[in-house]
Amino acid sequence: MLFIAAAAFFAGCAPEQVPLDSPYVYIEDSEGNSKMDVGAAANDYAVTLYVHTSSRLMDRDVKVSYKAVAGNGLTEGRDFRIKQGTSAELTFAPGIYRMPIHIVWYKAQAFDPAADNTLTFEITECSESDFTIGLLSLGDSHLKTSYTFTRTK
């Protein structure tokens, strides 16, 4: 009986496995999507995207940069606006893992279905070189590196 108790005790003392801890940064909406259609009639339609980091608690700020690229069918200020206070560089203080990007869509004054009516937010850089941009998944190594809005009729 003593042998069984000792074996159980020492089995619990096996060397710990190192957990998978690959830090990453990604972008999505509140539903977890990486794309959305916005109707041309949408007016004052507010959308919030979120840039997330996933890592152990950092002892310093993590800076994440993104760019917003509008297709030739969209014009900032006329079709949409990235709300004031949303910077193209987000600073994640220690303990902060999610930062918002606020966008407001306006009713399309002139909608050309043949034009490129997309607005894409793409994560471009992270101050921490060991962070992966995007989620890692089998078969597709960088999910959610960008978020695309498509203006539809």
Give residue ranges: language-model regions:
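Sec-dependent bacterial lipoprotein signal peptides
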Residues: 1-13
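Short boundary segments that mark the start of a structured unit
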Residues: 13-153
